[in-house]
Amino acid sequence: MKLKISKSASNIALLYIMSIAQVILPLVTLPYLARIFTVSNYGVISYVKSVMVYANLIMQFGFLLSGTREIVEAKGNIEKIGKIVGKITQAKLLLSVIAFIVLLIMIKTIPILNKHAIFTIIMFCQVFLDIFIYEYLFRGIEKMNIVTMRYLISKGIAVALTFAIIRNNGDLIKIPLLDVLGSLIAVFWVNFEMKRLKIKITFDSFNNVISALRESSIYFISDMSGTAFNALNTVCVGIFLSARDVAFWALTMQFIAAVQSLYNPIQDGIYPEMVKKRDLKLFRKIILFFSPLVLLG
C-alpha cells in the first residue's frame, strides 16, 4: 500500500509542478507582452487562444482519460500499446479535419478572427501538433516525469524566445510561431522517448477507430462540461465586443482558471492507479493527503 501511495503521490506532485508552470509561465510574459502590444492585440491573442481551447477539446475528444485507461489495461504489452496509440492518432487526425473546417467557418463569420486569419491558423497548427505528443500514453505507463519535463522544456524555450524575439506591436504573428516551435520540440522529445521505450506505432482499421471515438465520447462530454465554460465566455465576448474588451475579460478569467487548475492534478495523478487497482482506500488516502494543499490554494 505504501508503494502504491508513493507512486500516486509522485504522479500528483509531478502534475502539480506542470499545472503550476502552466499558470506561472504565461504570467511571466504577461507584463512584457502587455507593454509591447496594444490592448487590442493582446485581446486578439487571448481570444484566439480561447477558440483553440475548443479546437483542442475536439481533437482530444476525451482520449486523455480513455486512452490512459486503455494503456493501463494493456499491462505493459508493447505491441498492444503501439496499436492503441496508432488507433487514437488516427481518430485525432480525423477529428482535426472536423476542427479545422469548423475553424474556417468561424474565421469567415467572426470579424476578430477574419482580420487575423493567418495568426489563427498558425495557432491551430500548435494545437494540431499536440496529436503527436501522446500524453495519455505516458500517463498510462505512469511516466509523469516525461510529461512534466516535456512541458517545462518546450514552454520554457518558447518563453525565453518571447523575450528575445518579440520587440514591438508588429511582432504579433511571432507569438503563434513560437508556440509551434515549442510544440515541435515537444514532438521530437516525445518520439525520442518512445524509441527509447521501444514503442512502435501501428495503425488500426477504420471500424476500430470509429469504435474508439464512440467509447471516448462520454469522456469528451465530461471534458466539454468541465472545461469549456470559461472559454465560451471569452468567445462570446469577442463576437459582440471589441478586442480591447476581450483583453480585460481574458485577464480576469486567466486568474480564475489558475485557481481551478489546482484540482486537476489529483484526479489525473491517481487515475492510472485507480484503473489498475480499483482501490477506493487508496483514493481516500490520497484525497486526505492533498486536501490541505488544495484548500490553501
Question: Which role fits each region the language model picked out?
Answer:
Residues 1-8:
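Short, Lys/Arg-rich, polar N-terminal cytosolic tail immediately upstream
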Residues 11-26, 147, 153-158, 175-194, ...:
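Transmembrane helical elements of multi-pass membrane transporters/channels
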Residues 15, 42, 84, 88, ...:
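Alpha-helical transmembrane segments and their helix-entry boundary regions
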Residues 20, 27, 59-60, 65, ...:
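Alpha-helical transmembrane segments of multi-pass membrane transport and lipid-handling proteins
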Residues 36-39, 113, 140-141, 168-169, ...:
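Helix-loop interface residues and adjacent transmembrane-helix termini in multi-pass membrane transporters
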Residues 60-76, 256-279:
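Helix-loop junctions and terminal segments of transmembrane helices
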Residues 91-221:
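Hydrophobic transmembrane helix module of multi-pass membrane transport proteins
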Residues 211-223, 277-295:
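Membrane-water interface at loop-to-transmembrane-helix junctions
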